[in-house]
């Protein structure tokens, strides 16, 4: 079972669904797309891993490639939106985006990482609320 620990000062919850994580040491950074989809869709790690592997077979790429992730999210009925930022404005942060979207699942991308958001709460194995969404 995955570990969930709520931070009552924000809309962040610790979330680490990877069955190999033992509660100490380094986090597995390579599986962030899997964790993000697990959090947003309330699916277990192995199910999402298998979904991404199947998508990878269809696009002839690794399961965590951009094309594999895009196909997986499309199969899960997600719509891709780009963040539009006007000149002089800042990009939204993960925490602000989550607060402004209190209903529904979202998978968002920041520099080198992906995060799952569900009903206004963002789930990850580290506090990434300050990161800007791309």
For each predicted feature, which ranges?
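Conserved active-site-adjacent core of cysteine acyl-enzyme catalytic domains
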Residues: 56-112, 118-127
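Glycine-rich, aromatic-bearing surface loops/beta-hairpins
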Residues: 128-134
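Sequence-level detector for tyrosine residue identity
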Residues: 12, 27, 49, 78-81, ...
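Active-site nucleophile-adjacent alpha helix/oxyanion-hole segment immediately C-terminal to the catalytic cysteine
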Residues: 1-62, 66-71, 75-76
């Amino acid at each position: 079972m995955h570990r969930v620990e709520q931070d009552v000062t924000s809309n962040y919850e610790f979330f680490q669904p990877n069955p190999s994580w033992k509660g100490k040491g380094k986090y597995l950074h390579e599986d962030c797309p899997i964790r993000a989809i697990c959090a947003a869709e309330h699916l277990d790690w192995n199910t999402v891993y298998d979904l991404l592997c199947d998508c990878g077979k269809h696009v002839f790429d690794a399961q965590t490639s951009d094309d594999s992730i895009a196909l997986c999210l499309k199969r899960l009925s997600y719509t891709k939106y780009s963040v539009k930022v006007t000149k002089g404005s800042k990009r939204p942060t993960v925490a602000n985006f989550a607060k402004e979207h209190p209903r529904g699942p979202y998978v968002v991308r920041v520099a080198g990482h992906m995060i799952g958001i569900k009903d206004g709460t963002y789930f990850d194995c580290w506090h990434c609320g300050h990161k800007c969404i791309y």
